[in-house]
Amino acid sequence: MKVLIVKTSSMGDVIHTFPAVEDARLNRPDVSFDWCVEEAFAGIVALHPAIDRIHTVAIRRWRKALLDGGTWREATALRRILRECRYDLVIEAQGLLKSALVARQAGAPIAGFDRSSAREPSATLFYDATYTVPRDLHAIERTRRLFGLALGYQPDLSALDSGIVPPAGDIAGISGRTAFLLHGTSREDKKWPAEDWIETARLLVEREMTPVTTWSNEREKAVAEAIAGAVPSTILVPKSPLAEIAAIIGHSTLIIGADTGLTHLASAFGLPTVAVFLATEPGLTGPRGQYASTLLAAPGERVTPAKVMAETEKLLALKLRAPA
């Protein structure tokens, strides 16, 4: 059986789909999987060994050039390639109109959430089989349940395995006990203040750990340079391809991150990960894993560096006690 997964974005949503793929790999060894994803996240999808072929879309870029002939040539080529693959089933795991339209291009039966479960009920008009999955569950569990219903097995929800390992990469000059500080995030209301990141870096050095940080745009660069300027032992990694950053994250001792896709990647690798959530509900989309913890800003309170460090110490102690 040949199945196409459609989960185009965001990075966190893509990573939240990995446990469902791992369930399916174990329960349905007769099924092969391809994946259709935004071009920016193809390298993330490639981390899972069960994915045979990756098809990329560029919906974000296409929207900015709808009248451009190149846009329509790319979209037409994608439709042709998907149909040539002759899929037996498409699992549309995003529940959005845009992803449903992408799924439709494959010309195969589509399975997805029903109207009460999909994020955009109009997407279900394009599905051939729909399944009820409560919306108040975490995104990881919702996707695992959907895959199980679509492929005919019961996932073991008492266990969680993303099925991915850190990639090999250039981590020259980065060794010892390191803590990667993932301060960058797409929304202003998700950003922990720069002074808190600086104080966290200082506290890490006091505990004989080396802070590591990086950036992906000019605003993030200013924060990264502020951390490195205030705490000189910080390793400042220049803006780098996603695969290289993933390799450095994967070989870190500890991750402290904002609500951002790379924080989810760290928890999927099984690393001690402390996420600082300031604006979103972690019960539905927060990092999950044996060594993942989320600190949520309560009304009228703030997440302090001291609270973050206390949480990191708990996770590191838990990891130390774990069997090899």
PLM region spans:
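Catalytic machinery of carbohydrate-active enzymes
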Residues: 1-324
